[in-house]
Structures are given as C-alpha cells and as structure tokens.
Amino acid sequence: MSLTSGSPDNTHPVSVEKSQSRKVLGATSLAHLFHDGATDLHYVLFAIWQQQFGLSMAQIGLLKMLFSGAMSAFQIPAGELGRKYGERKVLMAGTLLLTVALLLYGTSSTLIQLMVLIVIGGLGASVQHPLSSSFITQYYSAKQSRIALSTYNFFGDVGKGVIPSTLSACLLIISWGSALQWIALFGFLVTLGLYLLLPVGSKAAQAKPLAAKETHSQPHQQALNIPEPLRRRAFSALCVIGSIDNATRTGTLTFLPFLMAARGASATQIGFALTLIFIGGAFGKLVCGILSTRLGIIKSVAASEIITSAIVLGMAFAPLHVIWLLLLPLGVALNGTSSILYGSVAELSRPQQQTRAFAIFYTASLGCGALMPVIYGMAGDVMGVQQTLILVALLVLCILPLLIPIRSATRYSGQ
C-alpha cells in the first residue's frame, strides 16, 4: 500500500470538492429533468381538460397563461428567497409544491380548483432555473461551469421528452389522474434526492442567482462597438423577435393538439406527438447553432422562422398522417431559433449592463409567451383551431423585417 494513500495532504480536500460538485450537478440536473418535464406535461393535459371540463380555446389559453405567468413572475423573487432562507430549502420547497399540484390535479371537480392548483404548480416550477443555475456557478469555475450547465440543460430536454411520453403511455392502461400520481411519486423522489445531494451550507449570498435561463444561456461575448441609437434600435428589435418567437412556440404547442384531436388523434397519440416535437427541439439547438456559425445570425434566424411558418401552415391543412411526418422538423425549427437569439443579447447590450439586458429580454419573451395563448384562444373560439394556427404561422413572418436593425448593427461593427 502506498504511504501517501492515507495522508491528509491537499488531494483530499480537492477530491471532496470534486465529489461535492458532482453531487450538485447530479441534483440540479435531476431537478431540471423533473421541472421541465412537468411543465411541458401541461400541453398533454390541456387536451384532456378541454374534454373533461368543456373548455373553450380562450379558457385553455388562460390556463396556459396562469402557469407560465406564475412561473415567470416568481423567478426573480425565488432568487431572493434563496439568498435569504437558503437555496437548498427553497429549491426543495418549490419541487415539493409542483409535485403536490400534480398530485391534486386529478381531484379537481371545478375549473376554479384547477386554476388555483395550476398557479401553485407554476410558483413551484419558478424556483428551479434560478436556484439550480446558481448552485452550479457556485461549485464550478468559469470554464467548468459552461460544461456543467450544458449537461444541466441536456437533462431538461430529456425531461421534456420522457415525462410527457410517460403520461401518454400510462393513459393506455390507467386514468390521467392515476398517471399523474405516479409522476408525482417521482417528484417526491426528486425532492428526496435534493435533500440528500445538495450541500446544507450553501452560501447563496456569495452568488447572484440569475433569472431562469439567463445564467445558463448567457454567452461570454463582448458587446458590439456601435453607436448607442443603433444599439437601442437593434436591441428593441431583438426583444420583439424573442417575444414573437416564444409566442409562436407556446401558441403552437398549446393548440396543435386540438387540431390533431379534431382529425382523429387520441390523447395518447397527442402525447407522443408532443414528445416528437420536444425531441426535435433538442436537436434544433444543435442544428441552429451550427447554422449560425456558417450562415450568420441574420440568415439563420430568417431561415428557421420561414421554415417554422411553412410547417405550421402546412399542418393547418394537412391530414393526420402527414402531420406526424412534420413533427420532428417542427421541433427543430420551433426550438432552434431561441439558441441563436440568446447569443445576440450580450452583443447588442452595453458592456456593463448585460445582466439587465438579459432581464429585459426574458421579461418581454416570457411575458409574451404567457399572454399570447389567451389571445390565440379567443381567436380560436371565433375562427376555429385551423385558422388560429394559420394566424400563428403568419405572425412568425413579422420577424423578418425586424432583422433589418440587427443586420445594420452587425454590419456597422464589421461582423
């Protein structure tokens, strides 16, 4: 046996620190998997609730707004609560709150009860992104955190595919309420995992938890050297583009299931259809990232939005068997644009105000994503689901002229 194997030298603290970092990454990735999966699970539930409660399209949009609104509005307060009471406690409490909401969905006998539970679930889901990303930045160096955050993001995409498809599979043999009980059981196990893996002595005050996707999406880039009026116009255009892009995603995912149901798809088939879109979305981040390096930001965004518009428009008129063929490409185009837009926020903001710029960008984007399903829902009640999806497809094309200020800014800087 080596004489140094048991010596209390510096290797022991380093190994302990690495072990703790791995536990933190494992715990936060597990939380991301559950929270993102449980969030996108609602797209399957909306179609079920529409039949059970006899909801209109506007009411479905309202349910989506309640969850997304609660989740987006409470992210910054969640960071403050984490700093005050401890990130570990708040993250566990949020996970438990979301789990309890899922567990009680099946007991709802009225729409009001369901709406209250949806708000509770949204509040619980709000804590995961800011606090998990804060944990990772505390326990990993700048270079290591990029890899760790990529791993963390990957598990979020896994959750979006696995949990909705699990619900869909369970619907073949049990009721949706019973299926949610099994998913809630997984949520309780995730909470237990957070209790066992996350460190008790995390000092949140030493870190700055950022809202939602800001920490794990923000690239380390320098701002473009451009005149301030040009920067403002370009950044304003970028915020509007992000808002329309997010509204397109939420609108499509909320109302496409109803189009498929009208053409003969069962609740189980709709769940698997959404899973295919989420799988395509995971690949979309990679595909659009590669495109942006080869074609540039402007051409990549224009191409992805035109493709999104064409696919959504095609689905509005296509029979069910053709819609199935378009689901994966839709996911690629629908989810890929956002990864390109995130990289432009840092470039089009002032060097000392990038954190504020991300806060403005995500507030506009998430706010529009929460509000537009209600507007689309009211349109659906008047025009029908098919015409609503046509409206969604046409609205995407409004992004194209908004790219002009951004192109002017990048050309001025010589990029």
Predicted features along the sequence, with ranges:
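Helix-to-loop junctions at the C-terminal end of transmembrane segments
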Residues: F74-G86, K285-G296, G380-D381
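Helix-loop-helix hairpin linking two adjacent transmembrane segments in secondary transporters
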Residues: Y152-S202
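Juxtamembrane intracellular "pre-TM" segments in multi-pass secondary transporters
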Residues: P8-S19, A205-L238
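Extracytoplasmic gate region of multi-pass secondary transporters
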Residues: H42-Y43, R233-A282
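Residue-level signature of mid-helix packing/kink "hotspots" within the transmembrane helices
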Residues: D40, S68-I76, G161, F278-A282, ...
